[in-house]
């Protein structure tokens, strides 16, 4: 075991595990095993209305059935309100966040006007200087101006990435108007708290990475290495998800789905990885992953 490597898979319990989720789980599991590291599972269940009762337990059971069991007990984000509150208070004390009273309609109108003027579509910072008589609805993190707003990072799959937070995003939400914690704060805090060193996830989250890196800097926590795998799309070119009708995985025979997931990750042509047993598949798949992303040798 390599104590210097800690990775994770972080599903949302909005339904059963489907093929798109399996690709993300397999990629993160293979990277952890190729590095001799620790693989964790975090249940991202902050969005109460979308959370399906029993889905988290079903996902964990399906992962185990497919041969992927976390090395430490799973963590549920819904139990971590006090920790997120402490992180926000740290940012408040540092003067890095501010309350925002803008409604969704006001923000949409502002972005529509900016589009018509062919200017930036980022949040315009309406409440940066005060609420102007409006009640506080959310908390936003200030992003810097000028060259300090540009966050550049090297992705292990997608190569060098860069985003100007000031012009492409604007001050972004850490706590929503409905009282829910925003994805960016919860993910950054949980990764740091768990000592995550390597994040392997779908490329649909590539756009969030610059924000997360900037927030890590604000909180004074380490930045992990990132690898964003291509997402699975349906016949219409949309990301395969529960919302687009993705079906649950076949529980009785995991190998065909695993082989297809490995093929999607470019590890082998469909069917080339050995069948027969999960152990044989995972040995071959881990070796194939290590040849591309290292460092299993030795």
UniProtKB/Swiss-Prot annotation:
Database matches in InterPro entries: Glu-Q_tRNA(Asp)_Synthase, Glu/Gln-tRNA-synth, Glu/Gln-tRNA-synth_Ib_cat-dom, GluQ/Sye, Rossmann-like_a/b/a_fold
Location of the motif 'HIGH' region: 11-21
Residues reported in the UniProt entry to bind L-glutamate: 8-12, 44, 183, 201
UniProt xrefs under SUPFAM superfamilies: Nucleotidylyl transferase
Motif mapping: 'KMSKS' region: 239-243
The protein's required cofactors: Zn(2+)
Ligase listed as a keyword: yes
GO cellular component, one term: cytosol
Keywords: Aminoacyl-tRNA synthetase, ATP-binding, Ligase, Metal-binding, Nucleotide-binding, Zinc
UniProt cofactor note: Binds 1 zinc ion per subunit.
Keyword Ribonucleoprotein (UniProt): no
Binding residues annotated for Zn(2+), in chain numbering: 100, 102, 123, 127
Lineage top rank: taxon: Bacteria
MF term (GO), any: zinc ion binding
NCBIfam families: PRK05710.1-2 (NF004313), PRK05710.1-3 (NF004314), PRK05710.1-4 (NF004315), queuosine_YadB (TIGR03838)
Protein family: Belongs to the class-I aminoacyl-tRNA synthetase family. GluQ subfamily.
General function of this protein: Catalyzes the tRNA-independent activation of glutamate in presence of ATP and the subsequent transfer of glutamate onto a tRNA(Asp). Glutamate is transferred on the 2-amino-5-(4,5-dihydroxy-2-cyclopenten-1-yl) moiety of the queuosine in the wobble position of the QUC anticodon.
Protein name: Glutamyl-Q tRNA(Asp) synthetase
Gene designation per UniProt: gluQ
């Amino acid at each position: 075991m390599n104590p210097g490597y800690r990775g994770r898979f972080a599903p949302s319990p909005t339904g059963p595990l489907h093929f798109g989720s399996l690709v993300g789980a397999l990629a993160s599991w293979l990277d952890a095993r190729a590095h001799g590291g620790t693989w964790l599972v975090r249940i991202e269940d902050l969005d109460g209305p979308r959370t399906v009762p029993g889905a988290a337990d079903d996902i964990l059971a399906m992962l185990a059935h497919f041969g992927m069991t976390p090395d430490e007990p799973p963590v549920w984000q819904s139990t971590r309100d006090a920790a997120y509150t402490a992180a926000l208070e740290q940012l408040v004390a540092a003067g890095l966040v501010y309350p925002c009273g803008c409604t969704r309609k006001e923000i949409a109108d502002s972005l529509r006007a900016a589009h018509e003027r062919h200017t930036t579509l980022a949040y315009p910072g309406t409440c940066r200087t005060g609420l102007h008589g409006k009640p506080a609805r959310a908390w936003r993190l200030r992003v810097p101006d000028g060259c300090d707003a540009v966050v550049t990072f090297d992705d292990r799959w997608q190569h060098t990435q860069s985003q100007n937070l000031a012009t492409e995003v604007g001050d972004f939400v850490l706590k929503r108007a409905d009282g829910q914690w925003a994805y960016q704060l919860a993910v950054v805090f949980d990764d740091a708290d768990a000592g995550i060193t390597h994040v392997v996830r779908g490329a649909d989250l590539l756009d969030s990475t610059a924000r997360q890196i900037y927030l890590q800097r604000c909180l004074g926590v380490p930045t992990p290495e990132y690898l964003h795998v291509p997402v699975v799309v349906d016949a219409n070119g949309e990301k395969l998800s529960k919302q687009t009708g993705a079906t649950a995985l076949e529980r009785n025979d995991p190998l065909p789905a695993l082989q297809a997931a490995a093929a999607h990750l470019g590890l082998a042509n469909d069917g080339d990885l050995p069948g027969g047993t999960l152990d044989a598949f995972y040995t071959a798949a881990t070796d194939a992953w290590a040849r591309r992303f290292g460092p299993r040798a030795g």
